[in-house]
């Protein structure tokens, strides 16, 4: 394979590129992993983001093999976009997964352009868009959370730990990377006597202070203020089983894409529970308890009320009740 430098879309001249797109994607991801490339908050990328980009490398490589072509910077045009999306659609990937891979490619292309490796601006076209679709991100009600908390899991240490770590997420409304690593260094007492968790969010660097409710304090006491080490993949596996044991089996309608068509089917709620459900549940239940939105945002780290309201799960009926209670 021989690489020919792409032509500038504005001048028509060749732009000098020291490495191919494939090589740059590999370097970009490696630098994310070793910490030499930071995110927009000037912080190291989280493990889940790095995992997504590694997945993108595999998918991009498979796409190149399927098309029998090594795509380079100058090849990323609207025809490429249409082919890329069609290829994923034919493989029954969800709209949001396809959108995530398009977004990752756009981020990589922008970074390479800033580094002077190409002058291809077609990714900024409105037609080169990141596809998104609303997904059925559920939340657990306070009664469902209590059902999980009340289960006797003393005969299974791993499940017991997974349950407790998940509940910490429900009580703090933090991301797994933050709520699963809480230790004595994050716990302090305010002058008022209120016990709080004081932490810096790993993804954004936001400083948040969360009041410790009695249920949370019981878990912290159980582990002497240092949660046992847990792995997201394991907690994701166990929490579905735990939710089923707690009787959280309501049927939920979910949509998916098959052969480019949107279809729906029913899934038991327990099978939709995952580590991030804890954060969404915590934020939603705080809102339903009447805590002011701005106060909850101080805890979750959301920057705008619009962003926050899109994040929490409020039904049309709950919205109507909120309006009735606040004339």
Give, region by region, the residue ranges found by the protein language model.
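N-terminal core-binding DNA-recognition domain of tyrosine recombinases/integrases
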Residues: 33-48, 57-136, 151-154
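Short, charged phosphate-coordinating catalytic segments
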Residues: 110-121, 169-193
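Long, amphipathic, Lys/Arg-enriched alpha-helical "connector/arm" segment
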Residues: 132-161, 171
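Catalytic-site neighborhood detector that most strongly recognizes the C-terminal catalytic loop/helix
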Residues: 139, 201-205, 300-325
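Short, basic (Lys/Arg/His-rich) helix/loop patches that form interaction surfaces
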Residues: 155-156, 225-229, 240-298
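Conserved tyrosine-mediated DNA breakage-rejoining catalytic core shared by Y-recombinases
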Residues: 172, 181-219
């Amino acid at each position: 394979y021989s690489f020919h430098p792409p032509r500038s879309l504005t001048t028509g001249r060749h732009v000098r590129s020291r490495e191919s797109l494939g090589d740059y994607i590999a370097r970009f991801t490696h630098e994310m992993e070793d910490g030499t490339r930071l995110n927009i908050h000037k912080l190291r990328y989280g493990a889940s983001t790095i995992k997504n980009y590694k997945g993108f490398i595999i998918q991009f490589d498979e796409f190149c093999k399927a098309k029998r072509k090594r795509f380079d910077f100058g090849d990323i045009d609207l025809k490429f976009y249409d082919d890329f999306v069609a290829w994923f659609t034919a493989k029954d990937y969800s709209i949001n997964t396809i959108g995530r891979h398009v977004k990752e490619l756009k981020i990589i292309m922008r970074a390479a352009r800033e580094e002077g490796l190409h002058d291809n601006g077609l990714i900024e076209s409105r037609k080169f868009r990141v596809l998104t679709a609303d997904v059925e991100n559920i939340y657990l009600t306070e009664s469902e959370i209590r059902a999980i908390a009340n289960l006797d899991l003393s005969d299974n240490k791993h499940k017991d730990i997974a349950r407790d770590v998940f509940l910490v997420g429900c009580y703090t409304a933090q991301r797994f990377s933050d709520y699963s690593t809480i230790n004595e260094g994050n716990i302090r007492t305010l002058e008022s006597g209120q016990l709080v968790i004081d932490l810096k969010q790993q993804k954004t660097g936001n400083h948040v202070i969360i009041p410790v409710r009695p249920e949370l304090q019981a878990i912290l006491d159980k582990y002497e203020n240092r949660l046992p080490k847990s792995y997201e993949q394991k907690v994701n596996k166990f929490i579905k089983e735990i939710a089923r044991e707690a009787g959280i089996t309501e049927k939920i309608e979910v949509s998916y894409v098959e052969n480019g068509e949107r279809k729906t089917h029913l899934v038991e709620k327990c099978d939709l529970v995952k580590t991030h459900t804890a954060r969404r549940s915590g934020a939603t239940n705080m809102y339903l308890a009447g805590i002011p939105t701005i106060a909850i945002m101080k805890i979750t780290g959301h920057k705008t009320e619009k962003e926050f309201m899109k994040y929490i799960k409020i039904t049309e009926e709950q919205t109507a009740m909120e309006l009735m209670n606040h004339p």
